[in-house]
């Protein structure tokens, strides 16, 4: 299997050091972010591209356009700016996340947003990675909803799914769509006290033997079904971000996953 690393795995590392760490881990694919750390807001795209080339890594995506399914206000301008940045830095895709504040978004609005985003992506040769969020307050929880909306928007070939093991588990999903999946995010929850309905990004750590999200079975199912893309670490927990040696921790998680497979 192919491992990739999202910058959120080691957000305190400068981008060049993060790229170097990824290569040292034996991986060659990375994801950069526009939230924490905000690479888009702090570095010229040309510098990002140069750093990636120097380290020998490929930028899979910029994470993330939010809330992509509410196509109003400044969203279109932000989408164009992110897409332009992606092209200039050498990224291949944009991660697209739905509104996640308890507000219901009509299905027709989801389809309309995908239609509006389609030319922005196609004109730049980018893929849109549509990521259902499994939280109860999410406006798009299920992958089947995303797939149907992509079809209704005529977005086949432009959009792929982001399969996130955390959100797959939270949404209670059982179906896998390897032919639709462009990237997989992996993270674990090990806190035995938190109820599934109360799991948040802050609970997401690296995958180890205490994982409650069935990462190993999800990974096995995806591989068995034919998915051959990267699996990208995306832990949000402060205890991961504060690690003195994130490379060692990631190496340990990689070894655990490989041993389980």
PLM regions and their residue ranges:
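Gly/Pro-rich active-site loop or hairpin
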Residues: 39, 73, 104-107, 139-143, ...
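Hydrophobic faces of well-ordered beta-strands that scaffold small-molecule active sites
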Residues: 3-7, 30-32, 59-64, 94-96, ...
């Amino acid at each position: 299997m192919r491992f990739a690393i999202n910058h959120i795995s080691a957000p305190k590392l400068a981008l060049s050091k993060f790229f170097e760490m990824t290569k040292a881990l034996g991986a060659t694919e990375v994801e950069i972010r526009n939230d924490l750390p905000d690479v888009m807001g702090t570095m010229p795209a040309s510098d990002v591209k140069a750093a990636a080339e120097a380290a020998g890594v490929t930028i899979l995506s910029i994470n993330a356009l939010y809330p992509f399914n509410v196509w109003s206000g400044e969203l279109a301008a932000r989408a164009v700016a992110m897409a332009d940045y992606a092209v200039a830095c050498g990224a291949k895709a944009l991660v697209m996340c739905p509104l996640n504040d308890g507000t219901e978004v009509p299905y027709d609005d989801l389809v309309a947003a995908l239609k509006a985003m389609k030319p922005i992506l196609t004109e730049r040769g980018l893929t849109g990675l549509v990521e259902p969020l499994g939280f109860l307050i999410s406006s798009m929880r299920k992958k089947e909803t995303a797939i149907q909306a992509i079809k209704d928007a005529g977005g086949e070939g432009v959009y792929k799914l982001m399969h996130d093991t955390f959100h797959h588990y939270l949404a209670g999903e059982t179906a896998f769509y390897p032919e639709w999946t462009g990237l997989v995010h992996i993270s674990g929850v090990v806190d035995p006290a938190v109820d599934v309905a109360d799991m948040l990004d802050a609970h997401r750590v690296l995958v180890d033997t205490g994982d409650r999200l069935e990462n190993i079975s999800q990974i096995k199912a995806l591989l068995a079904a034919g998915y051959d893309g990267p699996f990208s670490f995306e832990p949000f927990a402060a205890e991961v971000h504060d690690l003195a040696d994130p490379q060692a921790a990631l190496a340990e998680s990689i070894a655990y996953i490989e041993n389980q497979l």
